[in-house]
Each structure stands twice: as C-alpha cells, then as structure tokens.
A protein has these predicted regions:
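A short, conserved structural fragment
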Residues: 1-7
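Conserved AAA+/SF3 P-loop NTPase catalytic/coupling segment centered on the Walker-B
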Residues: 123-150
Length: 272
C-alpha cells in the first residue's frame, strides 16, 4: 500500500525481538481538527506472526499519544485482527468485528446499519469497532456513496475504530483524494450522556437504557446482565420475552447474592 501523499510522516517503532524474527510496526500519524487523531499501522513479518507482547506495547504507545482511529495494513493472514484484539485486551475494551463486505451486500439501508452498530457500541461502553475490509471497484459510485454514508454515521460514536484496509478510508466520491471524515471523540462521561440522549428515541430500545443503568448501578457488564436475564427467564419459563425493569433488577440481585454468598443486596422499593 502506498503512503497517503504529503501530510503523513513515518515513524518507526523499534521492537525488541529475538534474532530469528524480523518484525516491526510502522505508524503514519496525522492530526487534523476535522479528522481527529489517527494512525496507520503496517506490519511485516518473516515466517511467523508478530510477537504479541511487542505489538501490544507498540499499540499502547500510539493509544497513549492520542491515536483513536487505526488502519491495520498488511497481507492476508498477517494478524491484523490480532493487532486490534491486543490493544483492546490491554485496555480491557470489548471489540465488535464488522464484516464490511457483508454490510455492503445487505439491502439494509446504511443508516439502519449505523444505528445497529452504534447501539452495540453504546451497550458495550467504551468499545472498539474493527471493519474487516471492503474490496470492489473504486469507480462504483453507488457502493462508494453507501460507504461514505456508513462512515459518516459513525462520527458521533465513542471508542476506537479500526480499519483492516486503507482502501476504506481513501475511497473517493469527488476528486482524487477526498477522504471520508470521521471524528472519534474521547470517551468522557459527558460525551456518553450526550450520545445516549441523542440516540434515545431512534437508536436505543428502552431495555437498552435499563442495561446501561444496571451496568452502572451493579458494576456488571451488559453481557453479564443479559446472561442473568436469560437465566432468570429460563427459570420462569419466559424465554425470549422482552425483560422489564423488575426482571432485570431481580436477575442482577440474584447474581450479586450468588457472588456474595449471602443476602447482602437491598433494592429500594421505587426501583421494583
């Protein structure tokens, strides 16, 4: 893959490896008021996958210096998804892998796809999204417009964004070098509140807000709460039913009591 012209400078991050393996991460960084901070990572390895610990250290270095959008470049099988997973593991962030090819093949409108992806991201908290490639003809205007709409819809999303191909970023609509502008804000409490408020009517179901509330109240992840609800519904022979707030509270209370080994959790009456 060729460098983007002009505005990017290369910075090589040395990795301490044994003599049998030659590997490196190379980061191309750009900071722009409209784009935010992003990097392009390119990995090269002779014979073996990159050593996980060294990759993780390199990615953390970039993350701690403000990078929030990543382009993971390399040949098929070069460990691009592994690189994405390593950073998320180090920062204890859940990652949502999105198959861009399948998204483009679906007849579902781009705005609906964006709503679904953002809903997943909000439920996961400060999560990461990894787009796994987008092949095709650059001259396909319809596909390019759909791609632009999809990426523009991610502008208000909080978290980390990964692309496994620089091609997704450089697809042009007008002119030769027009890029899709996506800004990924830092995941502050204020940003999250504004995001929840903006998405409340259109992108979040009431049960989703219950999960967000419970995840904060009980310090449980949304996935753990969902597991609690499914177990609770199984006991009541209500599998598949939309859980209400009382079900959610009861399920979480049961889970916490189980963890504590005693009846140590009290729920105020107004929450039942």
């Amino acid at each position: 893959l060729e460098n983007t012209e002009g505005s990017m400078s290369a910075q090589e991050i040395p990795l301490k490896l044994d003599g049998r393996i030659s590997s490196y991460l190379q980061a191309y960084e750009q900071e722009d008021e409209e784009l935010g901070r992003f990097v392009r990572l390119q990995s090269s390895c002779k014979g073996k996958l990159l050593i996980q610990k060294e990759i993780q250290q390199g990615l953390l270095h970039l993350y701690e210096n403000g990078a929030r959008t990543y382009f993971l470049c390399g040949e098929t099988g070069s460990g691009k998804k592994l690189q994405c997973g390593l950073l998320c593991e180090a920062k204890k962030l859940p990652v949502l892998y999105v198959d861009s090819v399948r998204l483009m093949e679906q007849r579902e409108p781009s705005d609906q796809i964006c709503r679904r992806i953002k809903r997943e991201a909000i439920l996961k908290g400060n999560a990461a999204i990894c787009f796994t490639g987008l092949p095709g003809d650059e001259e396909d205007r319809v596909d390019a417009q759909k791609t632009e709409k999809l990426l523009h819809g991610m502008r208000d999303w909080n978290g980390l964004l990964f692309f496994t191909s620089i091609y997704e970023w450089n697809r042009s609509i007008e002119g030769e070098r027009k890029v899709v502008k996506v800004r990924i804000p830092d995941n502050t409490t204020e940003d999250r509140i504004l995001l929840w408020d903006a998405c409340l009517q259109e992108e979040l179901r009431p049960a989703d807000l219950n999960l967000i509330y419970l995840a904060d109240k009980y310090r449980l992840t949304a996935g753990t709460i969902i597991d609690c609800v499914e177990e609770y519904q199984d006991r009541l022979l209500m599998k598949g039913a939309q859980p209400n707030m009382a079900d959610l509270l009861a399920a979480c209370t049961d889970q916490l009591e189980h963890r504590l080994g005693r009846d140590a959790v009290r729920i105020e009456a107004k929450y039942r």
